[in-house]
């Protein structure tokens, strides 16, 4: 877990550098890492997920960002894909590489100013982040598409935080069906490796009981 904590410090450091260099101006922060750093989600993740919300010359932006990261870190991968800008880099001060993924398509989304912080770092970064309701919308789509148990963990977290569900009956049925397919080892390893011991033990024992209850309420409404 010490490795994951140090990685979190790395994430905050990078966000602070990006903000100070004005790279965050056209972007909004989202995804699991955003939920952890801005809303205290108790699951570790290793990527920074961002979305363009303003029109910029993306080719020029990508070139500038590559140069900036190369000057501060060891840049190991940089690709301008059709849908995303992908950059991966490492630092001798931290044990894991960090990946930044920026969605290129500009879509209407709900966001607000939040403070990204870590209990393991003194730095705090004020930035634009998805609202809980927008995060819920994104997570429902991701869970149905990827069927990744970590997305379902995030969904349960969002429901506990009071995020509006926006889950229709068809989606609720599909999500519930996917949950029944998760094996014991998926809870212990795939999900458990991203959780602290207490939270891991809870989910190995209780699975997604709360989420399933809420999905059933949605189907029966």
Predicted features along the sequence, with ranges:
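Structured mid-to-C-terminal alpha-helical surface segments
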Residues: 1-27, 38-40, 53-221
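Glycine-rich beta-strand-to-loop/alpha-helix junction loops that act as flexible
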Residues: 29-33
